Every structure is written in structure tokens, then in C-alpha cells.
Amino acid sequence: AALCSPMLGIELGAMPTSLARLISWLMEWSTRLLGLESPYTPTQGRYDPVSFADNKLTHDPLRYAHFRQIYNDYPEVQLGGPSVRWLNQALRATQQTMTLAPRITTPLLILQAQADSIVSNERQNEFCLMLAAAHHSCEGDQPSVIAGAKHELLNERDELRIQAISSALSFFDRNP
């Protein structure tokens, strides 16, 4: 399997994951206790179009414009910021994935976007080290880094996108 910028951890900046888990759990618990709908996480909200200059997804202006056009044409697919419940569940799921990593025996290629600010590259590195320690396969015992790429590898500029696709196809040739 080839994974493009997998969410094995969320990029939280300076906040430790354990603190983010605690805060998100407390916020989710309190909203459930009060019978409220799960609110957005702090600083987040409904879909708010982001300019190309400020986007965290791609360096390719045409692919970004296409993505934005889809959101304009089909508002029902627009994604806003994460809810507290989503964050809590995502943090739990990524922790569980890391815990179960040594049991994975399927050969894996982790394609890592070097300039990713959405998911944690550090956790991808840890994941590959855990697989290597368990004598399982993460191609090269480390992620395959696409230098300069943002999160959406398959929507990046052609030279970055082609590098990601070529790496995946070569991996599939070696692991039929």
C-alpha cells in the first residue's frame, strides 16, 4: 500500500499530543453532558474560502482553483474546521494506529510532504521506525520525502506530483 501524507498524527505546533487529547476529551465530554452539538475547535468554524497564497494544500494554482470551483459548485462537500468530537476521535484513532503499527505486515510506502502543516511528519517518521523495529516493511525504513511539497501530494505542481506518483508506481512494481 502507498499512503500519501497519511494522518498518523495531527500537526499541533508546540502543543503536546497528550494535552490536545485531554482538552479535546474534556470539551467533548462537557458538550455531551450539556446535550449540545459538538462545536468547532477553538479558532475554527464553517467553511471559509482561503486564498491561494494562504492555502496549506498545494503549490499549484490551477489545481487549487479547480478544488475551490468544486466547493463553489457543490457546497454540500465543503469542509469547515474540525469539530471537537472529530479532533478527539482523530487523536484517539492516530494513537491506536501507532499502538497497532507493529502488527502491520503489508508492505507500505509512506509518501511524506516535506512542507506539510496539516499532519505530523514526525509521527510518520516514528511510524516507519516502529515498523522497522518489528521487522515489517516501511519502504526504506522511513518515509519517502517529497521535498517542498504541501499536504495534497496528488494535487501538487507537476514536478512534485510526478515524483509522488512515480514513487508509488515503482513501489507497486516491487510489491505486486
Each language-model region and where it sits:
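Short, conserved loop/helix-junction motifs that constitute active-site signature segments
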Residues: A101-T105, M130-S137
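Acidic catalytic loop of the alpha/beta-hydrolase fold
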Residues: A115-V119, A134
